[in-house]
């Protein structure tokens, strides 16, 4: 499957859980300059001036059946508000909008006014009036105004009402480059990078000071070793039968109550592009976006064991979103010992999904091989939030933390009870390669002299492991460090990747500009010039350039280059893109077919691109014509595309390249008309083909009559230096004679032309074919009309000289081709 790199929405309320200090006010600029591109930065809610109030009492307004006058304590004063909600309750805390408040749901700024003769000092708000969609609200939340559930009286009167709703925060949308999808597709991954940036900023004034000003919260980023203490051993058996599963953790939770998640959790998921489902599934999705660790929960009523194995050949599964798939032994499944209950790392199955009646679950946290997950997703043409993270690589060291955090939330938000210790089965740990980094090399690459201690501190802030313990002072610039990137960083493999991280922390925008030191001024090579000028020539001739994929289908390959060794992609994106092309004509036929299906005719396209063979790549030029080549308003007749027009364009190209091509009649190309195709020869080597499309090809690809030509642009051709020979202006006139004759169709004009030139090598300067006439009664002969140009630089040709030449030409043509003069 092919797609653009994903974006990641960072939610302030989740991000600040991982910082012990308030977040920087210029977080957007810091992110854009030091981490990755910021695509958007905006407040989660546009609502303003909303506070928490408490209903003291309410009474009906005289003359109205629904309206009540409500006395509300806003913490600083008591206000009277007219409200028509049916769910008013004394003592309940509510959302109060006063004069000047802006409500996103109704897109209005409030003003105090009289209603039924009673002055109203604001408005009590429903969630819908705050712009929250009712689709994911409970029936109770949709009924009237919103009533805070605050049994412990933790929400202060007069405080910002958006805070307990989880709406008082910003959204930072990251545009992720492919190499950073793995570690920045989570709040914790971004928090760790942001911590490194903030720490490096605080140490810029004192390079020798260690950067320890910004730390992530221990309570959020470390496991509690006592959380599962004093629990009995689990009866659940876990067995891993495949190396693609490095680690599998499972925990049984009982007494689960399936219900909607708290509003703050639903809002967080919605802002991340994930629809809330129920509290259990929502908790696993929260862990997904916060820690980057995919989890899965099974309804475990009938599950006694977990077995991770390869899928069986032709094994059928139905996913929880009711998609049916047929698997093979290259896929990985989670089973209950007998049947599959999940497609590993991608999606759960319908039978074991969480239902409204579920009371007992098994929570799964595992590490699966990125290659295995990616191959299965490509084959099945499916992708999920979980598979995206697994195939890009997750941080295996975070699995225990994410697993424990999910268990805590299941106890808190789903009334779950952990009755047994989790089952932890680990086969192996993923490691990053050790990289040797020379500090002098860092300076040369970045172009800025960095203090060795500063380099070390920056690497430590980024969670690199440095395996050298030597003191890094100002004089040790040539010291070599052996280090490893953190497990979340799958993109750091060589020393240049490490230098890229150091450059980010320094700030690419702060790198001083330097003049490039090169011995000579750069210029285009002769080959590059010829390619560029060739493009201009074809555009000036009325062609449109196309740029097509290098990958084609096996069907298209067989049509143009059958029975040849080819290069096939191991994991093609689709069946239409699986073989590297050996001819540009296959791509041009697809372009013509696309145009003709949309009733676009009279087209002329060309492409200059690479073709691929087992041992080499070749640059080629191909062009295609169909319909009218020239649509003229000034001439009486349009110029239609034909074999001769195509040949004329090719002659223009060969003249531009300074080469002489010869034509060899052939019938070896099945996609061309058998009577109208020729190989192109240069120095007696076949370097191309020209011809008219075969009627069967036209039918198959919905083409009108078209003409194609392809020419291999070898280095010899492109590196040919065009030479120009200047001649004086002729002093003597040119003599022109026409010659028409009947000749067998088996003889080509090229053969006849060569014979004529050999007969009069000096005075004949040009031979043109200006008419061809097919005899109606026979297909064996046709009439050719030639125009011959005679000229001599040294003298004026006499009539008898020209007649003598014409006699020699005629006799030679009769001798070799048995012509009949007309």
Curated annotation (Swiss-Prot):
PANTHER family: PHENYLALANINE--TRNA LIGASE BETA SUBUNIT, PHENYLALANYL-TRNA SYNTHETASE BETA CHAIN AND LEUCINE-RICH REPEAT-CONTAINING PROTEIN 47. Belongs to the phenylalanyl-tRNA synthetase beta subunit family. Type 1 subfamily. Residues 44-162 form the tRNA-binding domain. Mg(2+) binds at residues 491, 497, 501. Its EC number is 6.1.1.20. It catalyses: tRNA(Phe) + L-phenylalanine + ATP = L-phenylalanyl-tRNA(Phe) + AMP + diphosphate + H(+). GO terms for cellular component: phenylalanine-tRNA ligase complex. Residues 430-513 form the B5 domain. It is found in: Cytoplasm. Its main location: cytoplasm. Disulfide bonds: none annotated. SUPFAM superfamilies: Anticodon-binding domain of PheRS, Class II aaRS and biotin synthetases, Nucleic acid-binding proteins, PheT/TilS domain, Putative DNA-binding domain. Pfam families: B3_4, B5, FDX-ACB, tRNA_bind, tRNA_synthFbeta. Tetramer of two alpha and two beta subunits. GO terms for molecular function: ATP binding; magnesium ion binding; phenylalanine-tRNA ligase activity; tRNA binding. The keyword Acetylation does not apply. It is an enzyme of class 6 (ligase). Binds 2 magnesium ions per tetramer. This is Phenylalanine--tRNA ligase beta subunit. InterPro entries: aa-tRNA-synth_II/BPL/LPL (IPR045864), B3/B4_tRNA-bd (IPR005146), DNA-bd_dom_put_sf (IPR009061), Fdx_antiC-bd (IPR005121), Fdx_antiC-bd_sf (IPR036690), NA-bd_OB-fold (IPR012340), Phe-tRNA-ligase_IIc_bsu (IPR045060), Phe-tRNA-ligase_IIc_bsu_bact (IPR004532).
